[in-house]
Amino acid sequence: MEKIDFRNKINWHRRYRSPQGVKSEHEILRIFESDRGRIINSPAIRRLQQKTQVFPLERNAAVRTRLTHSLEVQQVGRYIAKEVLSRLKEQGLLEAYGLSELTGPFESIVEMSCLMHDIGNPPFGHFGEAAINDWFSQRLFPADAENLPVSQDRCTVQTLRLQEGEEALNALRGNVRRDLCHFEGNAQGIRLVHTLLRMNLTWAQVGGILKYSRPAWHHGPVPETHSYLMKKPGFYLSEDQYISRLRKELQLDTYSRFPLAWIMEAADDISYCVADLEDAVEKRIFSVEQLYQHLYDAWGEHAPGDLFNLVVQNAWDKSGTNQLHHSAEDQFFMYLRVNTLNRLAPYAAQRFIDNLPDVFNGSFNHALLEDDSPYSRLLELYKNVAVRHVFNHPDVEQLELQGYRVISGLLDIYSPLLALTLAQFRELVEKESVRSLPIESRLYHKLSSRHRLAYIEAVSHLHPQAADFPVWEYYYRCRLIQDYISGMTDLYAWDEYRKLMAVE
């Protein structure tokens, strides 16, 4: 069994311009303070204030955005991290685990991973993701690249269509098509941090947001030992070399996860399950009395002293005693949040410690709050009530359908750039305006300079004479469009769609 020594995991070096030499405890903490500054001041964090949590295009400031949600996750992550360190200290294990001088970085990595955990999410959340993946799947037919005869390949892009006698190129074409049809917020977060924003964070800090270990182009069954860790795509083909280096620097096996990412995940689970219900009451989807009844009914069999009684019933009873001086609604959610956090955060911390050998080597194939305990049951209760009574509400569904249409429509609008030949697009990139391509020139001008530069740099590392050059160029061109549209806020995407569709 691998010896647990967090000095081998909390790697304070960076991909570029990394600090050199032996560092003191204070110097290492300053390196992670630099990470905090880079993250908090990044435009990706600022954009979270206009991205959806549950309710798109919400004007009520009391309803959560991705930013306010992420701040709450950050606080819960800090609580769990401190609880882990406190319990290890009580057991006299901080020094044995190499943490005696790394408690500050441990907490900071968790906090900043929590703050960043949603930065890759597109406008309109999961419906934005679905719109991107459906749009590309309807053109690239990724499944056709796996086992159909070449003659039956339905891919509409000539460059990516399988060709007889080109086995090596066909393998790349298949990988590219699968990769582009598996857009995922977590994978986009890795791309943002490394490729688009070039934040040059420490290896440990990036490890904290690598939630899933499955490559986006992976096909076939996943190893049973890593089925949970590979539940979703975690990174793209464009970041493959970077992730390979990250694994080496953090001493992670293939498909393994960085230990502190489990805390980030638990903090997110605890935060959003109560927050979604509170936002639904704020939106008047149901009253607090109706919510209590939904929770009571969904719990099933009740017993004195069970977790429902200690958390939900306790919050309900207390909220009814102060109605003269406080809003019962506010009181209920205050007690519900406090009760939930005070039960689930210590439990998550203990699960982290109890499974530390597997967590440390990155192979623990579960979430911390995913077991057959009452704590997991409470979390599932909140999630199930939200699914049943919030996410399927007509107002929510209508906004999600609108969001799906907006993202699909924007991809349609920018698709002429993907229809250009390699020679035409290269000319457009070099000249920025081509008289014979008036529409495409104007669309290209609208793309963010940051995303255009990322495309130009990626293509500059390719060899134009190589047989695979057209495939890679088209891949990075698609990434350019996905980067631009997924980087929009909900409001910007909505306005852009209406303008370009000449709705106003």
UniProtKB/Swiss-Prot annotation:
GO process annotations (BP): dGTP catabolic process
Limits of the HD domain: 66-273
Catalysed reactions, semicolon-separated: dGTP + H2O = 2'-deoxyguanosine + triphosphate + H(+)
Gene3D superfamilies associated with the record: Hypothetical protein af1432 (1.10.3210.10), putative deoxyguanosinetriphosphate triphosphohydrolase like domain (1.10.3410.10)
Assembly and interaction partners: Homotetramer.
Function: dGTPase preferentially hydrolyzes dGTP over the other canonical NTPs.
Stored HAMAP family: dGTPase_type1
Protein name per UniProt: Deoxyguanosinetriphosphate triphosphohydrolase
Gene field: dgt
